[in-house]
Amino acid sequence: MKVLKFGGSSVANSENIKKVLAIVSAASKETKIAVIVSAFGKTTDNLLAGANNALQDIDIAKQQIETIKKLHFEIINELIQTNTLEVYEKVNSLFNRLLSIYEGIFLLQELSDKTLAKVSSFGEKLSSFIIANAAKELFDTT
């Protein structure tokens, strides 16, 4: 088995993700593989900035979510043609959970290391879900 790890700049945009999927496709013809992807470029930084901003101003944190959401929806639009609604619904659900965390930070006026870790995990949850769906579509041979 081969493990392939792709960092943030490797999955920063749809063109780079297409290159990653081509590498995955080629590698999977040789052996079984596991793929690990980071959050899309700068997403983790933006998520953490949003959490820190939520301490002071929830509206700024909400704007940061919208900026991150826009990038993710653009990538979905460029990579996924089938079951798009399901992908949008799941991604929206993740963003709604993130917003709830930001609102909790604002209301409690508390941002622990545990909460920061939880917030930063959303980048990988989002990117891995989107890339997995793009791969399913690309590699579907039926």
What are these regions (language model features)?
Residues M1-T142:
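Nucleotide/pyrophosphate-binding catalytic subdomain
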